Amino acid sequence: MISFETRTRMEELEKKYKDILSVVNENEVDREIEEIEKKLTDPSVWDDQKKAREYTQKLKRLKNISEDLKRVRSLFEDLEVAIELSDEDQEMAQHVEEIVQELEGAVKKLELEIILNGKYDPNNAYLSVHPGAGGTESQDWAQMLLRMYMRWAERKGFDVEIVEFQPGEEAGIKDATILIKGEYAYGYLKHESGVHRLVRISPFDAARRRHTSFASVNVIPEIDDDVDIEIRPEDLKIETFRASGHGGQYVNKTESAVRITHLPTGIVVSCQNERSQHQNKQTALKILKAKLYQLEMEKKQREIQEIQGELKDISWGNQIRSYVFHPYTMVKDHRTGVETANVDAVMDGDIDMFIEAELVYFARRSG
């Protein structure tokens, strides 16, 4: 006998599968794979390395989707047979439960593969954290967020490089940027941009009062050098300074840190992680180029958001997620409604539940 809970899960899976098939067709995916494979057999396509790389990335993504579409279809066929036999065989009812559990994982994986179809979704990601008003309290919160994303990246098997790290005077950070290197790093993290709110008993308050702190997160893709963005030397203010950052294994101290201000937009980028001033300058210019490119894309789409590396107002009205440590424990995303009471796991990088829900939420909003 199949339980009511399992039947409910089956109905939800069928709905999700129907939604998937409304936007992707297995035969069309296989046909597109054949077309790209045919193009890649032409030696002339490799004359344009950028185009060839785009083809190979797309081919890899389509092959993953094709394999997972076939797997999900096969699992649904197995489920149909198991359901027919379950009325007479209790062991088969248990097998239904096992297939449903396997299907849930397979459908979720397929959903994400279909959703992660943006031009720069496969790229590495620059992630910056900036504390809001509130001094040491918000600076400590910013460092907690930075660690959360580093732990998430480590869980994914991604590499993390500190690009900039400016410590707070007592604790925490005034500013930090990391480069997360891994397949679809930007695709996963792009909706983490926004204001994150913390409510807790402050460890810096002798009276043990409850404090609310804010920090902003900004995520941009690492883009290729051949992207056509003009940066005129006369538009740049370039300063050098001695790095004062710390961060254990991630930070390589240097006396050749570089700060670049793009005068027309006011965008400021810094780099202190490389071993020479020249390398720091090149990395900072690369980040600036990525920010300017994204700014152009936003203008073309007529979106109102600013993506200059910090939000206009790091305050009450703009938060995307709240992290409450006191008087109860709760982390809640205000866009998707996803929440959990396990704040320790979240702060240790267990944030896939939020990221996956964001991807589905924004994909449905965009239609």
UniProtKB/Swiss-Prot annotation:
Q: Which family does it belong to?
A: Belongs to the prokaryotic/mitochondrial release factor family.
Tell me which domain of life the UniProt entry assigns to the organism this sequence originates from. Bacteria
Pfam families from the UniProt entry? PCRF (PF03462), RF-1 (PF00472)
**Alphabetized SUPFAM superfamilies for the sequence:** Release factor
Give the species this sequence originates from.
Thermotoga petrophila (strain ATCC BAA-488 / DSM 13995 / JCM 10881 / RKU-1)
- Which keywords does this Swiss-Prot/TrEMBL entry list? Cytoplasm, Methylation, Protein biosynthesis
What are the coiled-coil residue ranges? none
Q: Where in the cell is it found?
A: Cytoplasm
Task: Tell me what PTMs the record reports for this protein.
Answer: Methylated by PrmC. Methylation increases the termination efficiency of RF2.
Could you identify this protein by its name? Answer: Peptide chain release factor 2
Query: In the record, what terms sit under GO molecular function?
Result: translation release factor activity, codon specific
Q: What does this protein do?
A: Peptide chain release factor 2 directs the termination of translation in response to the peptide chain termination codons UGA and UAA.
Q: Name one GO cellular component term.
A: cytoplasm
Q: Which InterPro entries match?
A: PCRF, Pep_chain_release_fac_I, Pep_chain_release_fac_I_sf, PrfB
> Which positions bear N5-methylglutamine?
249
Quote the PROSITE patterns the UniProt record gives. Answer: RF_PROK_I
